[in-house]
């Protein structure tokens, strides 16, 4: 179903500074990316509250990172699923999209801008996918 998302964070450097919060819709492959100040549960929840103003999310699947420990503050607990430890394939769509982000922001990138994040999000959402019959996620949503 549309609205079932996988969530993750993409760290730019080992320093405890800003990172990317990524959400990927399982069906449409639509990607939402937000630059957050740190990898804390507070920053993640604050970003999610902003995202929920513009997007409908039915369920969310996360890994067991501490940044996702307070998702129940934002979502109904029945809508939250946690992947098994060390089982990244349970959130494969999100992991593949994170690899696409790395094309533009390789590991060790010191700093990025909101403009660059918006560019990457737009590029991913307009990239044709074989699993969508060569439609982009944006085209798929328009046809849904």
Regions found by a protein language model. Give the residues of each.
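Mobile-element integrase/transposase regions
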Residues: 1-20
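Mobile genetic element proteins and their domesticated derivatives, centered on retroelements
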Residues: 8, 23, 29, 48, ...
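Active-site beta-loop-alpha junctions of metal-dependent nucleic acid enzymes
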Residues: 13-16, 33-55
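Coil-to-beta-strand transition motifs
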Residues: 16-18, 26-31
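Catalytic phosphate/metal-binding cores of nucleic-acid and nucleotide-processing enzymes, i.e., regions
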Residues: 27, 47, 116, 120
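Short, surface-exposed basic-aromatic patches at helix termini and helix-loop junctions that form
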Residues: 50-53, 72-79
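Acidic/histidine-rich, metal-coordinating catalytic segments
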Residues: 55-70, 86
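Charged alpha-helix within mobile-element recombinases
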Residues: 75-82, 86-144
């Amino acid at each position: 179903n549309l609205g079932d998302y996988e969530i993750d964070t993409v760290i730019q450097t080992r320093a405890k500074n800003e990172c990317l919060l990524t959400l990927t819709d399982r069906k449409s492959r639509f990607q939402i990316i937000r630059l957050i100040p740190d990898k804390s549960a507070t920053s993640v929840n604050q970003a999610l509250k902003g995202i929920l103003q513009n997007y409908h999310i039915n369920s969310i699947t996360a890994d067991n990172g501490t940044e996702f420990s307070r998702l129940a503050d934002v979502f109904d607990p029945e809508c939250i699923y946690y992947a098994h430890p060390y089982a990244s394939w349970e959130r494969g769509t999100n992991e593949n999209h994170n690899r696409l982000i790395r094309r533009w922001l390789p590991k060790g990138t010191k700093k990025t801008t909101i403009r660059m994040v918006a560019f990457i999000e737009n590029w991913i959402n307009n990239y044709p996918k074989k699993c969508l019959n060569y439609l982009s996620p944006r085209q798929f949503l328009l046809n849904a």
